[in-house]
């Protein structure tokens, strides 16, 4: 005699195989262009400085131009390929996992930017080195920072180093998504 499926059985049959976390800056949002437009320096040039120098230039440029940190983050452009990637992962109900700055306005600006994503509200804020706290079996992180991906993988998750939307989408397809 065949067993009648319970609600739990039905849920197990339809629940998603993976949980997807997607970074914002450098994946969906063009932080590099925004930084260069703000500071007149490329992020690769600014990265050659120490971390404090990078962010001091950012903060000083905001003050000089009269731009709030909220406005900076809320108004960033899409990363090239960002909309394509978002449209691909959207059916899987992804979470945004992004690093805030020390200024609380960055959280509010990023939260408002995320509203472009069809009212999506699933957003987590973690410094890059703590993103792996959310890692685990069947949890995917799409991020453009190799060190973050390495920590994610070491914590048991599946990290996808984002270099372009087509490359990331291909890696997701290899996972059956």
Spans of model-derived segments:
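Active-site neighborhood of HAD-like aspartate-dependent phosphohydrolases
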Residues: 11-65, 154, 164
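Acidic, Mg2+-coordinating phosphoryl-transfer loop and its flanking beta/alpha structural elements
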Residues: 140-174
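Short amphipathic alpha-helix with an adjacent loop that forms part of the alpha/beta core around
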Residues: 132-135, 171-177
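Short, structured coil segments at secondary-structure junctions
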Residues: 90, 119, 155-156
């Amino acid at each position: 005699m065949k067993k009648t499926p319970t609600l739990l059985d039905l849920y197990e049959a339809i629940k998603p195989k993976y949980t997807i976390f997607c970074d914002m800056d450098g994946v969906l949002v063009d932080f590099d262009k925004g930084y260069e437009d703000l500071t007149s320096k490329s992020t690769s040039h600014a990265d050659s400085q120490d971390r404090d120098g990078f962010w001091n230039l950012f903060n000083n440029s905001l003050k000089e131009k009269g731009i709030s940190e909220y406005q900076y983050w809320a108004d960033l452009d899409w990363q090239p390929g960002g909309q394509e990637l978002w449209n691909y992962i959207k059916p899987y109900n992804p979470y945004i996992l992004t690093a805030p700055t020390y200024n609380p306005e960055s959280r509010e600006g990023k939260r408002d930017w995320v509203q472009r994503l069809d009212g999506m509200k699933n957003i987590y804020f973690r410094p890059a080195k703590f993103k792996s706290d959310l890692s685990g079996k069947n949890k995917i992180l799409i991020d453009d920072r190799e060190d973050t991906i390495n920590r994610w993988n070491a914590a048991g998750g599946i990290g996808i180093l984002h270099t372009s939307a087509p490359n990331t989408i291909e890696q997701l397809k290899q996972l059956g998504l």
